[in-house]
């Protein structure tokens, strides 16, 4: 018999999405609607969006405060910024109302800090409904726990009431155990659209992207696709640029609260002609611009997993990163991980000097770069494809969850 699952997510398509929302859509699009019926409760944010809408295999129910056609930046301002707080109660009541007519077999919460509170409350109210929690958090656990302290034990119940916890990294699995989950977390990482990021581009297309970037012959372009926030350490790359030869540039695709700080730092270090803040990039054209550059970098101070790294590996770019959090599951360094096939260049957090050393190594060892990028792409194709991940979610999470019902 078909099972009905209600998903809790702060946001959803078509606007204001991140890696968590991408994961929901990629997974649900690949699961047969004959086996599972998905509903989702999220914030509406934009008054032009309908309150109820079917997107792919998901029926979306929107709640919360709205303004007309807000930007991502508007979501961090009043009144929309209040939605993160009010969702903790409104989502529970919306789910409760929906349950009276839909009679859900299970609920699925996307990230503990975002939706674990309403999902845990729903499980307390309806103990017969199965509950899956997915951990995709990128911030340090201690920061999240401090932030959620006002919710008291209800935040802890996001973990302890879960029938299954699925995590995207070993690091997050350890956090689930520390928070009181008594089962064994199911480790299923996020994935990427491998066909999208491995697609070939003509030299004409790549030259067009290079021209737009202002890339000249002999230039080496580092690139990142990252929110401009503290954890992503874009500032460390800017500091590293000042230590590198004048032909090394840094293309930054992303927006966020750190932008003003970065603009000041770029001026202070005298690298205004070599660091390019390019704003948002559409996912549809991202592979073209990645391949027009030479090195992907994000020296994260914390990371749940990081889809951007895997996307860059699929595009056959050499990757420089830390091994913080979930990155350690897939980025293996020649020196730090001699027992693993090398898939990237690992640096310590907060170390512009190590970043500069890694960039110089990549620029002077083309044979190593070819070997590493080939190895990394093969790993991504074998382990991080959405078809594989969706199949694993069905066989390792949903089917066992409902086996006895």
What does each of the following model-derived ranges do?
Residues 113, 125, 131-148, 164:
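A short, histidine- and acid-enriched strand-loop-helix "catalytic/donor-clamping" loop
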Residues 280-281, 288-293:
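Short alpha-helical donor nucleotide-sugar binding micro-motif in glycosyltransferases
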């Amino acid at each position: 018999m078909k099972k009905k699952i209600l998903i809790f997510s702060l946001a959803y398509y078509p606007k204001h999405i991140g890696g968590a929302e991408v994961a929901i859509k990629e997974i649900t699009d690949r699961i047969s609607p004959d086996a599972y019926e998905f509903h989702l409760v999220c914030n509406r944010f934009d008054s032009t969006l309908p309150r109820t809408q079917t997107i792919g295999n998901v029926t979306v129910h929107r709640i919360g405060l709205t303004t007309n056609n807000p930007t991502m930046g508007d979501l961090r301002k009043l009144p929309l910024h209040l939605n993160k707080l009010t969702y903790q109660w409104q989502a529970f009541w919306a789910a409760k109302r929906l349950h009276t007519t839909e009679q859900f077999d299970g609920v699925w919460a996307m990230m503990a800090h975002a939706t674990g509170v309403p999902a845990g409350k729903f499980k307390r109210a309806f103990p017969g409904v199965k509950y899956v929690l997915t951990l995709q958090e990128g911030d340090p656990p201690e920061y999240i726990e401090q932030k959620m302290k006002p919710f008291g034990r209800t935040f802890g119940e996001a973990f302890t009431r879960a029938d299954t916890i699925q995590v995207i990294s070993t690091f997050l699995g350890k956090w689930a155990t520390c928070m009181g989950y008594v089962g064994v977390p199911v480790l299923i990482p996020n994935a990427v659209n491998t066909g999208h990021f491995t697609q070939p581009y003509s030299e004409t297309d790549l030259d067009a992207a290079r021209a737009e970037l202002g890339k000249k012959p002999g230039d080496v372009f580092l690139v990142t696709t990252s929110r401009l926030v503290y954890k992503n350490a874009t500032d460390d790359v800017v500091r590293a640029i000042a230590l590198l030869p004048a032909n090394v540039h840094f293309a930054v695709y992303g927006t966020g609260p750190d932008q003003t700080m970065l603009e000041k730092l770029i001026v202070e270090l005298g690298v205004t002609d070599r660091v390019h803040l390019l704003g948002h990039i559409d996912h549809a054209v991202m592979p073209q611009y990645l391949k027009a550059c030479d090195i992907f970098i994000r020296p994260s101070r914390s990371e749940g997993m990081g889809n951007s790294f895997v996307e860059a590996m699929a595009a056959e770019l050499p990757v420089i990163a830390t091994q913080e959090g979930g990155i350690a599951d897939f980025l293996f360094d020649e020196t730090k991980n001699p027992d693993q096939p090398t898939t990237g260049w690992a640096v310590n957090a907060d170390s512009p000097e190590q970043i500069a050393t890694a960039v110089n190594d990549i620029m002077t060892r083309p044979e190593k770069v070819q070997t590493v990028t080939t190895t990394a792409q093969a790993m991504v194709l074998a382990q991080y494809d959405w078809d594989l991940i969706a199949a694993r979610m069905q066989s390792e999470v949903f089917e066992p969850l409902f086996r006895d019902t």
